[in-house]
From Swiss-Prot:
Gene3D superfamilies: Mitochondrial import inner membrane translocase subunit tim13 like domains. Transmembrane segments: none annotated. The keyword Metal-binding applies. Its main location: mitochondrion. A motif (Twin CX3C motif) lies at residues 47-70. Disulfide bonds join C47-C70, C51-C66. Residues 1-13 have a biased composition (Low complexity). It comes from the Eukaryota. Residues 1-24 are annotated as: Disordered. This is Mitochondrial import inner membrane translocase subunit TIM13. Belongs to the small Tim family.
Length: 99
């Protein structure tokens, strides 16, 4: 009988842990999507302002080239900042438990 009651007592805790993990993953995914949307909006805003000085019905080849280069540089800078941030957070988490 103890195994019957024992399995019932552990189940709600496991359900709660699973729900917390699922919620955490869902929030992380939503944040990643929001960050990607923000990055795309910033790229569009900044690169368009820089490269398209005289809007017309189509882009010139120089405007297309400028937009492509601007986007590439913006993405590379964002990637570098993201890697540095993740490394710093990982380092801080590694140091925090030892305090």
């Amino acid at each position: 009988m103890s195994s019957f009651f024992g399995s019932g007592a552990g189940s709600p805790s496991n359900d709660m842990t699973a729900r917390k993990e699922q919620m955490k993953q869902s929030i992380q995914q939503e944040l990643a999507i929001a960050n990607a949307q923000q990055l795309i909006n910033k790229i569009n805003e900044n690169c368009f302002a820089k490269c398209v000085t005289k809007p017309s019905t189509s882009l010139s080849s120089s405007q297309e080239s400028c937009l492509s280069q601007c986007m590439t540089l913006y993405m590379a800078a964002f990637d570098q900042v993201s890697r540095s941030y993740v490394a710093r957070i990982s380092k801080e988490r590694g140091v925090a438990p030892g305090l």
